[in-house]
């Protein structure tokens, strides 16, 4: 569908940004749930956006592709007073409750104030071309559990 360029917020969410970058580059060890072993490889390349909800968000970062996978560890939430879900195109950690961040993330496509202080915001999709890609993913046809009928794959995560 195209590239999604994201500006990360290391000054506002340093641990969350570090976790994302280290998982994306293979610098951090994680447990691959597909094989049950510790690995030190890029987690995100080849994964899919496994959950898409129009007018809300697109979610990825699960090595299983089901919404049930992660890196085999959790880390604490990071909230910053300057970061709120008051606009679309924010990058945040998906979780299963307080301090359960792992590898799954989502990008909003609308203001989602009810998520404030529940999910760590650590980046933003700022350019119009990238926002169009996010919007296109957000309206993909979905089936059970909001999973796109046709896989939408993350081919490569890279950093400048």
Regions found by a protein language model. Give the residues of each.
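Cyclophilin-like peptidyl-prolyl cis-trans isomerases
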Residues: 1-160
